[in-house]
Amino acid sequence: EACRERAREWGLDVDRARDVVRSLLRDALAEPVDDPPSLADLADEHRAVDRLLAFRADTVETFVARLAAAAGSTTVNTYVLDPAAMAATGVRLADVEDHLDRVTAICYVDEPAAARERLRAVGERVALPVDAGISLDPDLVGSEADFRALVDAALDETDGEVSAYHHGLVTEAQLDWIERVLG
């Protein structure tokens, strides 16, 4: 209820937005299409969707600003998996950037070119240090050479930190890779 109250104070007609979104979803599920409209197109067509997305982004930005203020000298970082899809989650990097110290591009990929592209895409959207998070998921990284190639690609694209993720999946051999490649 607090969210609905804040939305009303913000000027968003929550019931209207809900009805529009339900109608759009009902239509999409009744007649699926190969190329659905983007959120940006839906926002252009439906003021209620535009207002809902703007409200969500404002809510996230307000939260991140409060978090940064409370953090004091502690580093504030956010993770970015797909920078092009961030707006759908309510995170507009341009809006929250002033409240962040760093951004981590999540590179859960198996190809060095994909890691480079992810880092480049994030770096183009922010004027902050961009770190790389590389997965050790065995379905993505099958050898030390694969891991080294991903780390090298990340280091080629950013001067930020490179971290290994999915420690719960790490084998003894992968611990050795981390030591040799990142150590």
Regions flagged by a language model, labelled:
Residues 60, 64, 115, 119, ...:
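Aromatic/hydrophobic pocket-lining residues that form the small-molecule binding cavity
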Residues 93-99, 119-128, 151-158:
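Acidic (Asp/Glu)-rich catalytic clusters
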Residues 32-49, 123-147:
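Active-site clefts of carbohydrate-active enzymes
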